[in-house]
C-alpha cells in the first residue's frame, strides 16, 4: 500500500515542494521516517501515532516507511505532522486519494488530534499556488492567512476528524480575496508636527527618507533623537503591493502576521535594545528565523544608544547594508532573508552625554576616544547622513508655532520617490542611495561650476572617494526634493553639512 501527499518546506521566504511518501508493507512492525529530517520532524512519528490512536485509527502491524522527498533538502518545522498523518490514512484506505489530489497540506498535530497553527503559511500557499496547486488544507487558525492569496481554495481544519470525514470539491472554501486594496497610512505613527525646533534635523530626516539614506543623530539626552526617529516611518511612502507581500511573508515565517485577512500595510519600525543578541538582530537560531534587520525590511531599523551595542555586533550589519539581504548558515543549511532597511542610528556624544559642553562633560580625552571607537569606521562609512542634534532651547520647548505635519513632508518625499522610480527604470537599484559607483557620473552629473566647487572642497576637507560619492548621492536627493533636474552648488553644500559631524566626533576627514 503506497500513497503520496504534497506539502512544502520553507527556504528563506520561499517554499520548496516536498512529497510525503508512505509505504505500508508486510514485515516486522516498525515505523521509520527518512528524508534528511531535523529532530522536530523526526518527533512527528510519535505525535502522528498518538493522534491517530486518539481518533480511533489503529495502525496495522506492518512495516510503515515514511519518506520526505527530495532528500537533499533539510526538513525542519512541525508543519509536516498533518501531511504525514494524511499520507498514512490514504495508504490505509481511510481517506480517498482523489480527495487530496493536487492539494498541499501543512499543520502541526496535537496528541488528541487537534490541528495547531504553524508559521510560514503565507509563503507556502503563495508559492504553491504559483506552481499550479489550487487547494490547501491548513490549520483553522491559519485560514485567514491562507486566503490572502487571491484564487487559492482554502480549507481550514481544527481536528484530524475533519480530514477523515469524506469531502469533495464543494467542501472547499472558494472565496477569492484580492491582495490589492486602497492603502491607509497606519495611524499608530506619531506626527512630526509634535516636534518643536530641530529644523535642521527634520530637514535631514526628509532628505534621508527621500533617497532612503541611512542616518545617524548624535546629541545629548533630551534633544529629541528618539522622538524624531519614531516619526520617521510617517514620512515614508506607502508600501507597494510587492513590498507588502514580501514583508508579510517574513512576518508569517516569524508567526507575527496579524490574523485579520490583510497583508501588512504599514512600513515596519523596529527598535531593538542594545542588549540584543546576534541571532535576534541578524537572524539565526535552531530554525534560522529572520532577525530584526529582516523584520525591518522596507522600513526603519532604529538603533538607539548605538555605541552601547555589544562589541562586534554592529559590524555584522556591514554586509546587509551593502547587499540588502542577510545570508545565514547553520548545521548545513544556508538561508537568505531580505534585509533592505533604512538604518536610523542615535547616540550620545560621549559616555556622560554632554560633550562638547566642557562645563558639564566629565569625560577625559581617552574616554571620548574609547566611546567613539565602539562604532567602527566601516559602519560610519555606510551612513550617508550624520548630523548633530542640539539641545532644545526654552523658546523651542514652549513654542506655540505650528510645525509642519508628516503628511506635508510625505508629499515631497513621495514625489522624490516617483522621480527616482522613473529615472532608474531598467536599473538594479531604485533609490539615490543605492546608485552604483559606475553609474554616479550618469545620474549625479556635475556642471563645470559644481565640479570646480567639489574639487575645492575635496582638497579643503580632505574627502575620501567613498565620502565624495556619498555627498553626490545625497545632493542628488536634495535636488530631487527641490524639483531641480541638475545638481547645484547649494545642493552640494547642504550635502556636505550632513557629513561634517564625522570630523568632530570621529576625528579626521569628513569621511
In which residue ranges do the predicted regions lie?
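Peripheral, non-AAA+ core regions of ATP-driven protein-machinery
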Residues: 1-216, 220-226, 329, 467-468, ...
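Basic, amphipathic alpha-helical bundle interface domains used for macromolecular binding and assembly
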Residues: 34-45, 60, 67-77, 287-288, ...
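Short loop/turn elements that form and flank the Walker-type P-loop nucleotide-binding site
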Residues: 59-62, 99-100, 130-132, 150, ...
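Residues immediately C-terminal
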Residues: 111, 301-302, 308-309
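P-loop NTPase nucleotide-binding/switch module
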Residues: 171-207, 211, 238-293
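Walker A/P-loop
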Residues: 217-258, 323
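Walker B catalytic acidic pair
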Residues: 298, 304-305, 316
Amino acid at each position: 500500500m503506497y500513497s503520496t501527499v504534497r506539502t512544502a518546506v520553507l527556504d528563506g521566504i520561499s517554499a520548496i515542494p516536498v512529497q510525503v511518501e508512505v509505504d505500508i508493507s508486510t514485515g516486522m512492525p516498525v515505523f521509520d521516517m527518512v528524508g534528511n529530517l531535523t529532530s522536530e520532524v523526526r518527533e512527528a512519528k510519535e505525535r502522528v501515532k498518538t493522534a491517530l490512536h486518539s481518533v480511533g485509527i489503529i495502525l496495522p502491524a506492518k512495516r510503515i516507511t515514511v519518506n520526505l522527498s527530495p532528500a537533499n533538502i533539510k526538513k525542519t518545522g512541525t508543519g509536516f505532522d498533518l501531511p504525514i498523518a494524511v499520507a498514512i490514512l490514504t495508504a490505509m484506505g481511510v481517506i480517498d486519494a482523489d480527495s487530496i489530489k493536487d492539494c498541499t497540506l501543512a499543520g502541526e498535530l496535537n496528541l488528541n488530534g487537534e490541528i495547531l497553527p504553524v508559521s510560514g503559511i503565507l509563503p507556502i500557499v503563495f508559492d504553491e499556488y504559483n506552481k499550479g496547486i489550487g487547494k490547501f488544507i491548513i490549520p483553522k487558525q491559519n485560514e485567514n492567512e491562507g486566503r490572502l492569496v487571491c484564487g487559492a481554495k482554502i480549507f481550514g481544519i481544527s481536528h484530524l476528524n475533519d480530514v477523515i470525514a469524506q469531502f469533495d470539491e464543494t467542501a472547499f472554501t472558494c472565496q477569492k480575496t484580492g491582495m490589492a486594496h486602497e492603502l491607509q497610512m497606519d495611524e499608530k505613527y506619531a506626527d512630526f508636527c509634535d516636534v518643536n525646533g530641530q529644523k535642521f534635523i527634520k530637514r535631514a530626516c526628509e532628505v534621508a527618507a527621500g533617497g532612503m539614506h541611512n542616518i545617524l543623530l548624535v546629541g545629548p539626552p533630551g534633544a529629541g533623537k528618539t522622538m524624531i526617529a519614531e516619526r520617521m516611518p510617517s514620512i515614508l511612502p506607502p508600501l507597494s503591493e510587492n513590498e507588502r507581500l514580501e514583508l508579510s511573508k517574513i512576518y508569517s515565517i516569524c508567526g507575527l502576521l496579524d490574523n485579520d485577512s490583510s497583508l501588512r500595510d504599514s512600513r515596519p519600525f523596529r527598535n531593538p535594545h542594545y542588549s540584543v543578541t546576534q541571532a535576534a538582530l541578524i537572524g539565526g537560531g535552531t530554525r534560522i528565523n529572520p532577525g530584526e534587520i529582516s523584520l525591518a525590511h522596507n522600513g526603519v531599523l532604529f538603533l538607539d544608544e548605538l555605541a552601547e551595542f555589544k562589541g562586534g555586533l554592529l559590524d555584522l550589519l556591514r554586509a546587509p547594508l551593502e547587499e540588502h539581504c542577510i545570508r545565514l548558515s547553520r548545521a548545513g543549511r544556508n538561508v537568505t532573508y531580505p534585509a533592505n532597511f533604512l538604518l536610523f542610528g542615535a547616540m550620545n556624544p560621549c559616555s556622560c552625554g554632554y560633550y562638547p559642553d566642557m562645563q558639564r562633560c566629565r569625560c577625559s580625552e581617552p574616554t571620548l576616544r574609547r566611546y567613539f571607537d565602539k562604532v567602527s569606521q566601516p559602519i560610519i562609512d555606510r551612513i550617508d547622513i550624520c548630523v548633530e542634534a542640539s539641545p532644545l532651547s526654552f523658546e523651542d520647548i514652549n513654542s506655540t508655532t505650528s510645525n509642519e505635519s508628516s503628511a506635508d513632508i510625505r508629499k515631497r518625499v513621495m514625489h522624490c520617490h516617483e522621480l527616482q522610480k522613473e529615472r532608474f527604470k531598467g536599473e538594479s537599484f531604485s533609490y539615490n542611495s543605492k546608485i552604483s559607483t559606475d553609474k554616479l557620473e550618469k545620474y549625479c552629473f556635475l556642471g563645470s561650476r559644481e565640479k570646480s566647487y567639489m574639487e575645492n572642497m575635496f582638497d579643503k576637507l580632505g574627502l575620501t572617494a567613498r565620502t565624495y560619492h556619498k555627498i553626490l548621492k545625497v545632493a542628488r536627493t536634495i535636488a530631487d526634493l527641490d524639483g531641480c533636474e541638475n545638481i547645484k552648488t547649494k545642493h552640494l553644500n547642504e550635502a556636505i553639512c550632513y557629513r561634517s559631524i564625522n570630523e568632530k566626533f570621529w576625528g579626521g576627514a569628513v569621511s
